[in-house]
Amino acid sequence: MSERSQIRRHPERSVPDEAPTILAEGLVAHVGFCHRGQPFVIPFSYHYDESDPDKIYLHGSVASRALQFLGDGGPVCISVTLLDGLVYSRSAKYHSMNYRSAVVFGSARVVSEEEKKAVIFDKMVDRYFAGRTAGRDYEAAPSAHLNNTLVVEVVIDESSAKARTGGPAGPTDAIDGAPGTCGIVDLRNLG
C-alpha cells in the first residue's frame, strides 16, 4: 500500500482484503482520469472476475474519449461502492450510511484481439444477467459490433477498501425515550 491508497479518515474501517469481493459484487464503476489537465469521472459498467483479480475490463463506443485516453496507457483510478444501509440518528450530524467501497489504481491498454473481446462480452452479459448464454438466450456479438466497441483492460497496481457497519452513533441514540427515531434501513435485501 502506498500513500495514494492509504485510508486516512477512519483508518479503523480499512478492509483491504474485501476489495475483490466489493469489485465482484458492484454494478457501476466510477472511472477517474485526467486528460489535458481536466479531471473526469465517468460511470461505466465493467467486468471483474475474482479468479483474475488484477484486472478490470471496461467497454464502450470506439468514439469514447475516456476509453481512447485510457487505452493509451493513461493512469486511472476506479471506485466501486456498495450501499448496504441508511443509518438514522436522533441527531442530524450522526445520520450516516453503511457501505463497502473499493478504490483501485492502475493503467490500461486496449484489448484488440477480437476473440478476447468476444469472451469479455459474454462474461459481462453473464455478470449482469446471470444464466444467459450466447447462442441460446441472445445473439453473440458479431464482428461488426466488436469492431465498433472499445474494450479496455485495466491492470490494477494497488487498491484499498473501506466499510462502515453498525448503527447510529449520536449522543442520544442509545437513550431510551429520547426524542426522535433512530435505526438502520437495510438496503442489501431489497427487491
What positions do the PLM features span?
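Short Pro/Gly-enriched beta-strand edge/turn motifs at strand-loop
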Residues: R13-V15, E25-H30, A134-R136
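Short connector loops at helix/strand junctions that flank enzyme active sites
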Residues: A24-G26, P39-V41, S51-P53, G71-P75, ...
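A structural signal for short, well-ordered beta-strand segments
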Residues: Y46, G106-A108, V152-I156
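Short hydrophobic-aromatic micro-motifs
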Residues: I56-H59, I78, A102-V104, V152-E153, ...
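Short, structured beta-strand-loop surface elements
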Residues: V62-I120
